């Protein structure tokens, strides 16, 4: 497989670091959107993870002339009918007066509020990720991964981002935000989706 520059369709530093670690191991040069200031904000107008991932990958591939990889991921909580789902990143935007200085903190606060009184055995949840790789001429491929776990009563840990402080990994018993980057890559929805994407990569690259 020819070495190539791959553009990760995100400015989220946490995602760039997490995904770039794995992609570099396959001999790929990895850049985030900060290297392409001409690419504007891409609005996620899809109603599924697949739609949003492809929308972002296609827009970035067309704008940069490189193969682009985008993901859309979110948290599905069974007791909340799989909310927040595709709205995970902006879950708290319609709820005023939540505690927290950041959107992540407010999202976590809203999740805990909605799960107030829900017993541990009913707090099952999963992180789900769909990745799309797209060429500048529009060829694309999807890969998916999921990470099953449950939602804690309170946040713990300083690593990660998003809902990591509340998500408990059943294998280790630790919150996702307590895991090292390597541990998280080995278990996480994003890591699983990426490994599946890399399995598909040679055929995708050859076209």
UniProtKB/Swiss-Prot annotation:
Function: Pyrophosphatase that catalyzes the hydrolysis of nucleoside triphosphates to their monophosphate derivatives, with a high preference for the non-canonical purine nucleotides XTP (xanthosine triphosphate), dITP (deoxyinosine triphosphate) and ITP. Seems to function as a house-cleaning enzyme that removes non-canonical purine nucleotides from the nucleotide pool, thus preventing their incorporation into DNA/RNA and avoiding chromosomal lesions.
PANTHER family listed in its UniProt record: INOSINE TRIPHOSPHATE PYROPHOSPHATASE (PTHR11067:SF9), INOSINE TRIPHOSPHATE PYROPHOSPHATASE/HAM1 PROTEIN (PTHR11067)
Entry keyword annotation includes Magnesium: yes
GO annotation, cellular component aspect: cytosol
Origin: domain of life: Bacteria
Chain positions recorded as substrate binding sites: 10-15, 73, 161-164, 184, 189-190
Annotated cofactor note: Binds 1 Mg(2+) ion per subunit.
EC number: 3.6.1.66
Classification via CDD domains: HAM1
Descriptive protein name: dITP/XTP pyrophosphatase
Keyword Isomerase applies: no
Protein family (similarity comment): Belongs to the HAM1 NTPase family.
Subunit note: Homodimer.
Provenance organism: Nitratidesulfovibrio vulgaris (strain ATCC 29579 / DSM 644 / CCUG 34227 / NCIMB 8303 / VKM B-1760 / Hildenborough) (Desulfovibrio vulgaris)
GO MF terms, alphabetically ordered: dITP diphosphatase activity; ITP diphosphatase activity; metal ion binding; nucleotide binding; ribonucleoside triphosphate phosphatase activity; XTP diphosphatase activity
Top enzyme category: hydrolase
One of the GO biological process terms: purine nucleoside triphosphate catabolic process
Binding-site residues, Mg(2+): 43, 72
Cofactor(s) this protein requires: Mg(2+)
Active site: 72
Catalytic activity: XTP + H2O = XMP + diphosphate + H(+); dITP + H2O = dIMP + diphosphate + H(+); ITP + H2O = IMP + diphosphate + H(+)
Record keywords, A-Z: Hydrolase, Magnesium, Metal-binding, Nucleotide metabolism, Nucleotide-binding
